[in-house]
Amino acid sequence: MEHQLQCCEVETIRRAYLDANLLNDRVLQTMLKAEETCSPSVSYFKCVQKEILPYMRKIVATWMLEVCEEQKCEEEVFPLAMNYLDRFLSFEPLKKSRLQLLGATCMFVASKMKETIPLTAEKLCIYTDNSIRPDELLQMELLLVNKLKWNLAAMTPHDFIEHFLTKMPLAEDTKQIIRKHAQTFVALCATDVKFISNPPSMIAAGSVVAAVQGLHLGNTNTFLSYQCLTHFLSQVIKCDPDCLRACQEQIESLLESSLRQAQQHNVSSETKTVEDEADLSCTPTDVRDVNI
C-alpha cells in the first residue's frame, strides 16, 4: 500500500479567546464617550466639498466593499476605511478625480490597523486598473494620517456588536447567526451617506435589531421580541428607544432598496446577454470588420 500524505490544513483563522475584561460595562461606557471624537461632519458635502457629491461617495464605497470582500478582509476593515474617508472629506476639499485614490488609501491604512497581513499598495493599484501609482498612494497615505492627526483607532459599529451579544442571554450558535447578519447590515450602512449622522453604537444596535427581526427569532424567544430588544439596547447605549427604532427601520429600508437594485441589475444583465447573443447570431463576422 502506497504512502499518501493527508492535508489537514483548514482556512479557518485561529483567533484568541474573548477577554471578559474588555467586555465589561466600564469599557463600554468609555467607548460610548469616545465614539463622538472620531465622528465625521454631517454636512461636509455642503460646507467643504465643491466637486464631491453623495452619489460619488456611494460609487467609491461600493467599489471599496467589493475589494474588501474579494480580498477576504476582516469585517472591521471596510467600516474603518469609510470612517477615514468621511473624516478626511469633512475638512479637506478634494477633486473628484482623486476620490478613488483616497478610497484606496483608506483601505490601505485600515488594513494595516486590522489585518495581520495588510493589503499592499501594488495590489490596490491593480484594483484601480492602474489608474493610480503606488507612490501616489503612499503620498496620499501621509496626507491622510496627518489630516486625521494620527487618530486612527476610531470606533466602528463592530466594536459595539460584541458588547451587545455578551449581554444577551442566548446560545452561542444563535449569537453567531445574529453577529453575521448584523455585520452585513453594518457594511451596508457604511455605503450610504444617510448613516453618517448616526453614531457607531446606534448603527450597531439598529443592525442587531434588524438582524433579529429578519431572522424572526422573536417568535421563539420573548427577550428577542421587537419591543423588549429595542428597550434593552436603548438602555445599553443610553438613547431614546424611538431613535433606535428609526435607525433600525432606516436599515431595513436600505436593505430593501439594495435588494431591489440588485434584482434590476440582474434582469438588465440577462437582457443584455440575450441581446448580445441575438446580435452575434444575426450579424456576420465580416460585417463587423468594415470600417465605415
Swiss-Prot record:
Q: What is its main location?
A: nucleus
Kindly indicate whether the keyword rRNA-binding belongs to this entry.
no
- GO CC annotations on file: cyclin-dependent protein kinase holoenzyme complex; cytoplasm; microtubule organizing center; nucleus; transcription repressor complex
Database matches in InterPro entries = Cyclin, Cyclin-like_dom, Cyclin-like_sf, Cyclin_C-dom, Cyclin_N, Cyclins_cyclin-box
MF-aspect GO terms: cyclin-dependent protein serine/threonine kinase regulator activity; protein serine/threonine kinase activator activity; transcription corepressor activity
Q: Does the keyword Ubl conjugation apply?
A: yes
Q: Which Gene3D superfamilies match?
A: Cyclin-like
Among Pfam families, the record links this protein to:
Cyclin_C, Cyclin_N
Q: Which SMART domains does the protein's record reference?
A: CYCLIN, Cyclin_C
Q: How is it modified after translation?
A: Phosphorylation at Thr-283 by MAP kinases is required for ubiquitination and degradation by the DCX(AMBRA1) complex. Ubiquitinated by the DCX(AMBRA1) complex during the transition from G1 to S cell phase, leading to its degradation. The DCX(AMBRA1) complex represents the major regulator of CCND1 stability during the G1/S transition.
- What keywords is this UniProt entry annotated with? Cell cycle, Cell division, Cyclin, Cytoplasm, Nucleus, Phosphoprotein, Transcription, Transcription regulation, Ubl conjugation
Signal peptide residue numbers: none
Residues bearing PTM Phosphothreonine: 283
Q: GO biological process annotations for this chain's record?
A: cell division; DNA damage response; G1/S transition of mitotic cell cycle; mitotic G1 DNA damage checkpoint signaling; negative regulation of transcription by RNA polymerase II; positive regulation of G1/S transition of mitotic cell cycle; positive regulation of G2/M transition of mitotic cell cycle; response to UV-A
Which compartment or compartments is the protein found in? Nucleus; Cytoplasm
Query: What interactions and quaternary structure are annotated?
Result: Interacts with the CDK4 and CDK6 protein kinases to form a serine/threonine kinase holoenzyme complex. The cyclin subunit imparts substrate specificity to the complex.
As for family, the record states: Belongs to the cyclin family. Cyclin D subfamily.
Q: What does this protein do?
A: Regulatory component of the cyclin D1-CDK4 (DC) complex that phosphorylates and inhibits members of the retinoblastoma (RB) protein family including RB1 and regulates the cell-cycle during G(1)/S transition. Phosphorylation of RB1 allows dissociation of the transcription factor E2F from the RB/E2F complex and the subsequent transcription of E2F target genes which are responsible for the progression through the G(1) phase. Hypophosphorylates RB1 in early G(1) phase. Cyclin D-CDK4 complexes are major integrators of various mitogenenic and antimitogenic signals.
Which protein is depicted?
G1/S-specific cyclin-D1
